[in-house]
């Protein structure tokens, strides 16, 4: 009877482990796509509120709850375009939600690649988004003294995207070893 012990220099082919890995990465990719779509939808609503508040005096958005919980007031502040960092009439002085939409679309696109280098790029973009979230949250709390549920929603979405990218990175690292 033949010995079925694998050769010492050959790795054992474990279909279950490979299938489990692929399902994990596929589920993470689905999560990134769904979270990214949610980010695009929230950003679209943000743009709607911003444009409506600027064009119609007295406009009250659904996300305006109280005196210090008004997303329309936050979204028409000086920090709502180009993060308040660029001079007026600059080519890049667009609403922050446009940058957010671009970020979410890039994250969705990058999720189609199961490559460690691409996931590292996602992590870099996620780090930039989290730094931006901290900056905007600081402005929201300490400068504007307001609360914006739509803004906070984007912070949560960005944190979820970061978590998913970290999970994918971890899975791809395990695969390489």
Question: Residue spans of the language-model regions?
Answer:
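Membrane-interfacial helix-loop segments of redox and metal-homeostasis proteins
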Residues: 3-177
